[in-house]
A protein has these predicted regions:
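Structured, charged N-terminal subsegments at the starts of enzyme catalytic cores
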Residues: 188, 194-278
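Charged, amphipathic alpha-helical oligomerization/scaffolding segments
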Residues: 112, 119, 126, 176-178, ...
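ATPase nucleotide-binding head domains, primarily ABC-like/P-loop NTPase cores
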Residues: 351-576
Length: 576
């Protein structure tokens, strides 16, 4: 029976998404952070690719957030699940029963296929037991539990387990076979055949004489061909030099060659004797226990539609959650604060697709990497809503403007990926995409010049973004004169207000922040949107950076004189 794939990442495989560009992931520092989660490049790339897919559907975010919480809190469950799924993956990749079924297969192949099928059932059983024994609450894992139960029921595993058990009881009686060889007057094999299939193993006897001892002593020669049910035997290596020239070996060789000439049993080649002996006896055993072979084939035909389902696709998905859980647990043990994001639920009378309430947030890079700011992480609060749509962020050089701008982008990437966010709380409406307009590398601006490249890139971003996107701008249009940069920047903010997307624009152009009221009035008159722009500042404590942000009018200076004095580069300090 065909089973639809189950996913721990996508409750609805038809949900729409937008993929963040590599540039955006780099601007937010997420590419470097993902490299910290695993030493394997393949796993790093998979995790980054998952995070780059932004699903605006709140149901996807909630689904992931709940699953991650279960994974984070249930260490034993996540370890057990990975072990079970890897066993299933091994069966799927290297097993034989999932390949084309051969009706002419011998008893040994048939039993091997049954064993693999039995192993798969055990894995499904273990998967269900693991989920049933874990304290899970997410719809994703509860759904997986139901999915496993459905696989079990739909494929008739309970009946199959019974059939396999009964077959095992029958086939377990096959312990050995007895071969008879007729000799002519020259002690050459005149015929070879199978006498019986036995329910006992032959056991090694004491040291016996060689072939001449047997024929020299009449009391060791049976008077008839009736087998006395003696299970003692003397094993010999058919390829060993010591026995290669013995009469018994010659008898065996002659018998095999004669049988071969009659289209019967082929001669045993050099190599793995156990495997060759099995192949040597396949046809004879199949004939003598034809009823048992028929029974095994009937069971396999009954369940021929069973295939290892695509549960193995859950392995990288589970790995995604596990790698993040392990890393965040490590950071939590070091004292960093993380919290589960909450998807904004619209009220009965109104909804706010622009809503974001972030409390005590910080840039994840400060926890992951050892930087100048890492030793003094300052948590911040920030809100977006239907009214507060654009922030013009100003403050001193190296005051933390870029750090907080990155942090907001990271919040959405992490939360919509289901991962705990760095901070105390985060309630939000998911974005359709994130766009960054950060300074470009010099080698990318040679053709158009830096300002030309910035303008072209902003136009492309603006055309692709929509009202539910997040736009993060870092010192945009500041590479030219103040007058030119200000003119372009102001028109850009006006256009952003027109579209209504959530935006943080950090800049040294304090005049742009002073003009927010003028731009807001213009937009209100045009009735383009009900969103407004606000001035936000990064506080300074004298010449010391506080990294604390606040919605407030710009302070109108960049603290250049204080910084110059701190580093001794004022005119007076330089020429004294």
């Amino acid at each position: 029976m065909s089973q639809q794939k189950y996913s721990l990442l996508y409750p609805d495989t038809n949900a729409q998404y937008r993929t963040l560009s590599d540039v955006t992931m780099h601007d937010l520092g997420m590419d470097l952070i993902c490299k910290k989660l695993s030493a394997k490049e393949r796993e790093q790339n998979y995790i980054q690719n998952v995070m780059a897919r932004m699903y605006a559907d709140p149901a996807v975010t909630q689904y992931r957030c709940d699953i991650f919480e279960d994974v984070l809190q249930q260490k034993k469950m996540r370890d057990d699940l990975m072990e079970i799924l890897e066993r299933i993956s091994f069966l799927r990749e290297y097993g034989s029963f999932n390949r084309e079924y051969d009706e002419s297969a011998c008893i040994w192949d048939l039993l091997h296929r049954l064993d693999e099928l039995n192993d798969y059932i055990k894995c499904v059983d273990a998967l269900h037991t693991c989920l049933a024994a874990s304290d899970i609450h997410s719809a994703g894992f509860l759904g997986l539990k139901a999915y496993v139960e459905k696989i079990y029921a739909d494929n008739g595993f309970a009946e199959l387990k019974k059939d396999i058990s009964e077959l095992k009881m029958d086939t377990s009686q096959l312990k050995s076979i007895t071969v008879g060889i007729n000799l002519n007057d020259r002690f050459e094999a005149d015929g070879i055949g199978l006498i019986s299939v036995n329910s006992k193993y032959f056991t090694k006897s004491g040291i016996l004489g060689n072939f001449y001892d047997h024929i020299a002593s009449k009391d060791r020669i049976n008077e008839d061909t009736i087998w006395k049910k003696n299970f003692k035997f003397q094993p010999f290596d058919v390829n060993a030099d010591a026995v290669s020239n013995t009469p018994m070996q010659k008898v065996m060789d002659t018998a095999i060659m004669r049988s071969e000439s009659r289209g019967g049993i082929v001669k045993l080649p050099e190599g793995d004797q156990a495997k060759d002996m099995t192949r040597y006896t396949d046809r004879i055993v199949n004939h003598m226990i034809s009823h048992m072979v028929k029974r095994v084939r009937e069971v396999l035909n009954k369940y021929v539609s069973i295939t290892i389902t695509d549960m193995t696709d859950l392995i990288p998905e589970l790995l995604y959650y596990i790698k993040w859980a392990e890393y965040i647990q490590k950071l939590q043990e070091q004292g960093f604060t993380f919290a589960k994001a909450s998807v904004y639920k619209a009220g009965e009378n109104e909804s706010d697709p622009y809503m974001m309430q972030a409390r005590g947030i910080y840039n994840l890079k400060l926890a992951v990497f050892d930087t100048e700011e890492s030793g003094n992480i300052v948590p911040n609060d920030m809100d977006f809503d239907r009214n507060r749509r654009v922030y013009i962020l100003t403050g001193a050089n190296r005051g933390g403007k870029t750090t907080i701008t990155q942090a907001v982008g990271q919040l959405f990437v992490l939360a919509q990926g289901g991962i705990y966010i760095p901070g105390k709380a985060f309630t939000f409406s998911p974005v359709t995409g994130i766009f960054t307009h950060f300074p470009a590398d010099e080698d990318k601006t040679l053709d158009l010049g830096r300002l030309g490249e910035e303008c072209k890139r902003f136009k492309a971003i603006y055309e692709e973004a929509d009202s539910r996107s997040l736009l993060l701008m870092n010192e945009s249009f500041s590479t030219t004169s103040f007058e030119e940069g200000y003119y372009i920047a102001k028109d850009s903010v006006r256009a952003i207000l027109h579209k209504g997307m959530r935006t943080i624009y950090n800049t040294h152009m304090h005049k742009l922040a002073f003009d927010v009221e003028e731009m807001n009035e213009e937009q209100q008159k045009a009735e383009h949107t009900d969103g407004k722009a606000f001035s936000m500042i990064v506080h300074m404590k004298g010449t010391e950076r506080s990294y604390q942000i606040e919605v407030a009018p710009p302070e109108g200076k960049s603290y250049a004189s204080e910084i110059a004095q701190k580093y001794g580069v004022t005119y007076e300090m330089l020429v004294k």
